Amino acid sequence: MSDQDALDTQEKELLEMKERVAEMEAEAAKLRAMQEQLDNETEALRNDKESIDAQSVYVGNVDYSVTPEELQSHFASCGSVNRVTILCDKFTGHPKGFAYIEFSEPSLVPNALLLNGSMLHERPLKVTPKRTNVPGMSRGRGRGRGRGRGRGRGGYRGRARGFAPY
């Protein structure tokens, strides 16, 4: 093979590599655009969720036999109720004993908070503003493993000899 042929093949390989790099850069730009669009959508969803949470209340100590209709009629004096959600155990299907009530506007939440302590099915309801769930907060970031281990080193030490005042 002559030097000219070697140069031609190297130039061909170089051109092919440049084409592949250009394709990869175009694909990377497309991926960046898609990621930016996704970020914007999740931000909009997060803002939407926070606005819904601002017009909702948590109702605790709810009797297991209470229906969503009963809760809606109980809170009807506060204003227009959009949604009543009684949470159930996903394995048994039984109610967990609390609910969320979403109102048509955030200004109705203080009226609902006045019903804190009101009786429904002979149980005092606990009514508080709904907190916005922050992902990862309940896990505590890694604490809680190996609880009850910090007892020093070594195994059985036997009965201590000597004076034990207590």
Curated annotation (Swiss-Prot):
GO terms for molecular function: lncRNA binding; poly(A) binding; protein-RNA adaptor activity. Pfam families: RRM_1. Its main location: nucleus. CDD domains: RRM_II_PABPs (cd12306). Residues 55-132 form the RRM domain. SUPFAM superfamilies: RNA-binding domain, RBD. One of its GO terms (cellular component) is cytoplasm. Residues 129-166 are annotated as: Disordered. One of its GO terms (biological process) is nuclear mRNA surveillance of meiosis-specific transcripts. Keywords: Nucleus, RNA-binding. It is found in: Nucleus. PROSITE patterns: RRM. The keyword Nucleus applies. InterPro entries: Nucleotide-bd_a/b_plait_sf, RBD_domain_sf, RRM_dom. Residues 140-160 have a biased composition (Basic residues). This is Polyadenylate-binding protein 2. It comes from Schizosaccharomyces pombe (strain 972 / ATCC 24843).
